[in-house]
Amino acid sequence: MKDLAKKLGANIRAKRKEKGLAQDKFAELADLDRSYVGRIERGETNITVDKLYILTQVLGCHARDLLP
């Protein structure tokens, strides 16, 4: 399960960078704490479907684009 979280986090980070968003701006747009976004991107935490949906809205993509 930990490996899945790391892959998902890496995909979120890659998509965020592709969109040209700094982590702090991304966190602000998603209404999440920047440190929490960092933990997500490093695969240190499992996120809920609700949080994944919020992140996809900010990134302008579908969840399937982020899931490994």
Give the role of each language-model region.
Residues 34-39, 50-53, 68:
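Base-recognition residues in the alpha-helical recognition helix of bacterial helix-turn-helix
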Residues 20-39:
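Short alpha-helical DNA-recognition segment
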Residues 3, 42, 68:
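Short, conserved catalytic or interaction motifs in soluble domains
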Residues 17, 28, 57:
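Alpha-helical residues within the helix-turn-helix
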Residues 13, 24, 53:
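Residues within the helices of the helix-turn-helix
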Residues 48-65:
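DNA major-groove recognition helix of helix-turn-helix/homeodomain DNA-binding modules
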Residues 1-17:
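A short, Lys/Arg-rich alpha-helix, primarily the initiator
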